[in-house]
């Protein structure tokens, strides 16, 4: 049990309007130390796994409270009789009591006013947590501890608004052990018998574009890549990604793309005004009243893939660069910056002069996890971001094809490794 208090890393008007809010709460956990009876326990240095329950007070009545339920893992950094330091990684769903649709004022015109909660747009959000966990044993059954870390909460544009929470925190508490006498004979396992593996994943989800727009737009992706397992818990490689985002559209109130307004001209006072008379946009050639094509809503990129294996669960962290990105020429701010001119298409690599939250970057991150459910079949959930701004959350199904290392293939087996309950005995 760890009571905590923290401070927000977020800035800007969405937080300044609440003035002096600080998060606080209580982290509870039920932990299962390593029994040294499974391969993944050995590979991760006998890590501890647990289930956590957190209660959060966001520090202002407009922001309300939250309850998060999540699995977590503690990776040993220092493990002695008198002191333990472990790295914590956690993630799961969280429910908030206050959001845009629970408040009395739901007028989008008051978006920046202190009368509205623009931090959350729905009840269920994703909760991510990482930090350092410290323990000092006092007796065989009791230890004093502390935890210092970071947590994030948002809905990944499944709902709007989606400013979300980013905070650091510190805590002090106690850990009680109930089975300190239970010991099992450690089992030694061989290394994973495969090196290269091919991943093929299809995923889909929905994105909301703007508060005043009730529609959700289809998003989907296809990934194919190959990774090499450097050791028993880490693999890296390259992958090809193709994304479709139905939210790249003129049929929404979101002002990220040029929408129904095409040309910008200077009026008699030298001010930039929207010109709604022209049929074709002089910047990108788009026709008024005709939505963007399927090709314009599609992106493709080449990504560096990183995988961190925790038994059946694998954490994913990808960084990619687009080599096909028609949407780079469709942004509202890009049209406004080039008012009254015919400009060449942007290069694939370009700066985002209006910062994060404006034009989306020419590169992307993807953070998530996949869980093996049968043989090499897995389910996956990931969040795709441009810089630190989420584009969407997706859910998918995939298959991994691991290839035996030279000299590791059992006689009579194919070149492809297939999981079994006790594969190390084969």
Which residues does each predicted region cover?
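Transmembrane beta-strands of outer-membrane beta-barrel proteins
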Residues: 1, 47-51, 69, 85-91, ...
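Residues that define the transmembrane beta-barrel architecture of outer-membrane proteins
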Residues: 20-26, 45, 63-69, 83, ...
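Glycine- and aromatic-enriched membrane insertion/assembly motifs of diderm outer-membrane
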Residues: 18-60, 214-309, 313-314
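Repeated loop/turn-to-beta-strand initiation elements of outer-membrane beta-barrel proteins
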Residues: 37-39, 81-85, 136-144, 180-183, ...
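Residues on the lipid-exposed face of transmembrane beta-strands in outer-membrane beta-barrel proteins
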Residues: 26-32, 71-77, 89-93, 128-136, ...
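Transmembrane beta-strands of outer-membrane beta-barrel pores
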Residues: 3-9, 32-34, 53-59, 91-99, ...
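Outer-membrane beta-barrel "beta-signal"
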Residues: 28, 166-185, 390-426
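Outer-membrane beta-barrel translocator domains and adjoining extracellular loop/strand segments
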Residues: 11-16, 62-66, 99-106, 156-163, ...
């Amino acid at each position: 049990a760890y009571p905590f208090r923290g401070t927000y890393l977020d800035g800007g008007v969405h937080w300044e309007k609440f003035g002096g809010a600080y998060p606080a709460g209580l982290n509870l956990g039920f932990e299962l130390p390593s029994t040294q009876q499974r391969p993944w326990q050995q590979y991760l240095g006998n890590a501890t796994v647990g289930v956590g329950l957190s209660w959060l007070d966001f520090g202002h009545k407009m922001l309300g409270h939250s309850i998060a339920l999540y699995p977590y893992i503690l990776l040993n950094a220092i493990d002695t009789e008198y002191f333990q330091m472990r790295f914590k990684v956690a993630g799961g769903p969280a429910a908030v009591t206050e959001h845009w649709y629970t408040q009395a004022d739901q007028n989008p015109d008051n978006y920046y006013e202190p009368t509205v909660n623009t931090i959350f747009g729905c009840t269920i959000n994703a909760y991510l947590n990482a930090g350092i966990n410290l323990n000092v044993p006092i007796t065989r059954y009791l230890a004093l501890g502390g935890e210092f870390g970071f947590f994030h909460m948002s809905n990944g544009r499944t709902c709007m608004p989606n400013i979300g929470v980013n905070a650091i925190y510190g805590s002090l508490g106690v850990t009680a052990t109930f089975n300190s006498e239970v010991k099992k004979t450690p089992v030694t396992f061989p290394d994973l018998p495969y090196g290269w593996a091919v991943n093929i994943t299809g995923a889909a989800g929905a994105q909301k574009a703007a508060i005043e727009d009730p529609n959700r737009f289809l998003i989907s992706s296809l990934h194919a890549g190959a990774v090499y397992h450097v050791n028993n818990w880490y693999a890296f490689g390259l992958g090809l990604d193709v994304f479709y985002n139905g939210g790249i559209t003129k049929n929404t109130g979101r002002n990220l793309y040029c929408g129904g307004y095409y040309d910008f001209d200077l009026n008699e006072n030298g001010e930039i005004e929207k010109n709604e008379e022209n049929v074709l946009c002089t910047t990108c050639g788009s026709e008024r009243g005709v939505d963007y094509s399927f090709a314009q809503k599609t992106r493709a990129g080449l990504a560096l893939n990183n995988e961190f294996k925790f038994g059946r669960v694998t954490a994913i962290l990808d960084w990619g660069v687009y080599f096909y990105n028609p949407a780079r020429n469709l942004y509202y701010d890009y049209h406004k910056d080039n008012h009254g001119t015919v400009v060449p298409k942007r290069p694939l690599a370009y700066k985002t002069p209006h910062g994060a939250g404006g034009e989306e970057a020419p590169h992307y991150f993807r953070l998530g996890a996949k869980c093996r459910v049968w043989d090499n079949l897995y389910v996956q959930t990931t969040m795709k971001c441009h810089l630190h701004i989420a584009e969407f959350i997706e859910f998918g199904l995939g298959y991994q094809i691991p290839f035996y290392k030279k000299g590791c293939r059992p006689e009579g087996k194919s070149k492809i490794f297939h999981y079994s309950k006790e594969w190390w005995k084969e």
